[in-house]
């Protein structure tokens, strides 16, 4: 067989191996699959497009996309935290998407200026307290929880999770590094227990009286709302006399290496629609990025 014939066969095989199934999208996500699978099932019903999830931790997924490059199966990268999305954009793994639908549905401050990523839900991190031990009038701000009056009354989640890191970053922006350092040191002094690995564990400790007050994402409380065991837990919106409660996002972007950027963009557009936003908020107990969505109680 001549070399030219071998070359043609090789090119054909490579082309076939890289051919993309246009009826299949793959999302690399750090979100728990059960939180987004109902939405994706609904999308398949509407469009016939199947969406496959590959789950993992955000840093490892970002690195995997970068290493896989043109050979990656990832069409979309989905994660939590604006800082993580920003890092993905800076890493060069996300495509600039110019979508009139996304730009209309998602407020400017909740998306990347170049279209690399888009917020799909909002999550507020604020104060929750045991109403048997604390009066709402005693609460005010994140910073106030560093006051000695809260000694042996505070529970917190570990700072190894991005939620507290992002909250502290926002405090540094508002209060300055030195003041924020003093606040965090005050929190540590006021701890009633060792730190917990999850917001759910913290809420259980507050409800059980191991401590009186904590800082968590609101959807964790909402997911416990139907259980009478936790009926003594109450939410307090922090810093209402100043900058307001800290709000972060979950979001996604189309990968730079996707072989199906058009359909990937259409999925993000649908996730920003009123139908998807209402479903997302109802299932996950997070807040929609689109205004005017009914989120119930």
Residue ranges and their predicted role:
Residues 1-24:
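Short, low-complexity disordered leader/linker segments with a strong preference
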Residues 83-87, 207, 212-233:
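A ligand-binding cleft/hinge motif common to bilobed small-molecule-binding domains
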Residues 126-133, 248-260, 279:
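A bilobed periplasmic-binding-protein/Venus flytrap-type ligand-binding module shared by bacterial periplasmic
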Residues 30-31, 37, 59, 72-210:
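Extracytoplasmic ligand-binding site segments that recognize negatively charged/polar headgroups
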Residues 16-87:
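Early extracytoplasmic/lumenal segment of secretory-pathway proteins
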């Amino acid at each position: 067989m001549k070399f030219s014939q071998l070359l043609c066969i090789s090119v054909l095989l490579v082309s076939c191996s890289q051919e993309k199934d246009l009826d299949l999208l793959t999302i690399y996500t750090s979100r728990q699959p059960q939180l987004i699978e109902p939405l994706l099932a609904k999308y398949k019903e509407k469009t016939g497009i199947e969406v496959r999830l590959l789950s993992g931790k955000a840093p490892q997924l970002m690195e995997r996309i970068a290493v896989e490059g043109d050979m990656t199966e990832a069409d979309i990268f989905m994660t939590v935290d604006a800082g993580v999305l920003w890092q993905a954009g800076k890493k060069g793994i996300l495509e600039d998407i110019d979508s009139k639908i996304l730009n209309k549905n998602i407020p400017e401050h909740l998306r990347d200026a170049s279209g690399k990523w888009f917020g799909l839900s909002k999550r507020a991190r604020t104060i929750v307290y045991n109403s048997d031990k604390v009066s709402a009038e005693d609460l005010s701000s994140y910073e106030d929880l560093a006051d000695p009056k809260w000694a042996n009354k505070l529970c917190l989640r570990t700072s190894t999770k991005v939620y507290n890191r992002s909250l502290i970053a926002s405090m540094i922006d508002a209060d300055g590094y030195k003041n924020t350092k003093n606040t965090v040191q005050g929190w540590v002094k006021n701890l009633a227990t060792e730190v917990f690995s999850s917001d759910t564990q913290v809420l259980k400790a507050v409800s059980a009286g191991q401590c009186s007050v904590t800082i968590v994402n609101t959807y964790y409380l909402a997911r416990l709302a139907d259980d009478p065991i936790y009926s003594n837990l109450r939410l307090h919106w922090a810093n209402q006399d100043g900058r307001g409660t800290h709000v972060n996002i979950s979001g996604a972007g189309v990968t730079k290496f996707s072989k199906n950027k058009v359909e990937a963009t259409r999925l993000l557009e649908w996730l920003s629609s009123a139908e998807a936003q209402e479903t997302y908020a109802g299932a996950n107990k997070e807040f929609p990025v689109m205004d005017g969505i009914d989120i119930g109680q």
